[in-house]
Amino acid sequence: MSGPVRFAVVGSGWRSQFHIRMAKALPERLQVVAVVTLNAAEAERITSTWGVPAVTSIDEALAARPEFVVAAVSWPAMPGVVRQLVAAGVPVYAETPPAPELEGLRALWDEVGASGLVQVGEQYTLMPGHASRLELVRQGVVGRPNSVEIASTHLYHAVSLVRSFLDVDMDEVTVNARAFRAPLADPLTFDGWVPDPQPQPRTTTIATLDFGDGRLGLYDFVENQWWNPLLARRIVVRGSLGEIVDDTVTRLTDGAVVTSPIVYRRTGVDMNLEGNEVVHTSFDGRVVYRNPWTGTRLSEDDIAVASLLTAVGAWVRDEGPEPYPLAQGCQDHAIGLAIEESVRTGSDVRVAKEVWA
């Protein structure tokens, strides 16, 4: 890749600033040429805080000649922003989800799907842990993957992980979901630490995703699970020859049952002065994942976001494949919506072949 990829951002909220921060961390690879805000006061705040140009219209942002545009706006606003950018012939990186509801997904696909200009900001498979597990699954370490249990993130993000580990594309799926309420303390939320947190009713949603041919996803999400430090993240990938449970791999090999860990090399521990970050992961003495951004001290989620941004940059320059096409993002959200519908109705919901399949 020659020179930093130039991109603009539509939106100035919390998620928008993830992308601005990545450009600041990787100036040799990424450059923000404009941020579109709601008004002049917000534009001034963004420029003052981040040192990047800020404008109040998409047309002004496009005048800066970005190679692609990140759409990081509210759910209701997303389809309109995507349509406007595609109409201008500009590649789009749309934050999740690309439209709020199923009819909106279908309408958006009908209008922009054929353009091939839209990628979706689904980064979870690029996080070091998930990328390591996915590499082992692709290498056949646990045989044919048959089931995936995810207890860490919600709806379309979790669905993306399930589909990736099971290697299912646009397969039809039957969803059965239920919700349960129980008291749980919530010491940390989006707004920060809570003084003297007391147990309050919180919802747990459990869903099965039946893709047929023995392939199963098990979705387990507790309200505010992203932030609550009382709740562990769990992933189980079960295959025909063994299973991966978080960072432990048990499988049948050479007629024996063998258990091996996924090992993280982390610097900045004890007397190590290299800085605190993941360098690589290894399995049975061989490296299976390397952090492409060593030296930046990025968090694991930031590593994934930076990797996705640069992958979109490679794609727009015809130097790499589509990172996460619109059709995949639509499918993830359609299945996530089916989980919510099954909870509401108490019945199975079938996700059949859609217009983007």
Residue map of PLM features:
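Beta-strand-loop-alpha-helix segment that lines the small-molecule cofactor/substrate pocket
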Residues: 67-68, 74-75, 79-125
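C-terminal helix-rich "cap/oligomerization" subdomain common to oxidoreductases
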Residues: 1-4, 60, 68-70, 117, ...
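Basic phosphate/pyrophosphate-binding loop/patch that engages nucleotide-derived ligands
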Residues: 110-117, 135-144, 163-169
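Rossmann-like dinucleotide-binding domain that binds NAD(P)(H)
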Residues: 144-232, 236, 327
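Short acidic low-complexity segments
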Residues: 53-64
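C-terminal glycine/acidic-rich active-site capping loop/insertion
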Residues: 211, 235-236, 241-323, 357
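Rossmann-like NAD(P)H-binding beta-loop-alpha module
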Residues: 128-147, 158
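N-terminal Rossmann-like dinucleotide-binding module
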Residues: 1-50
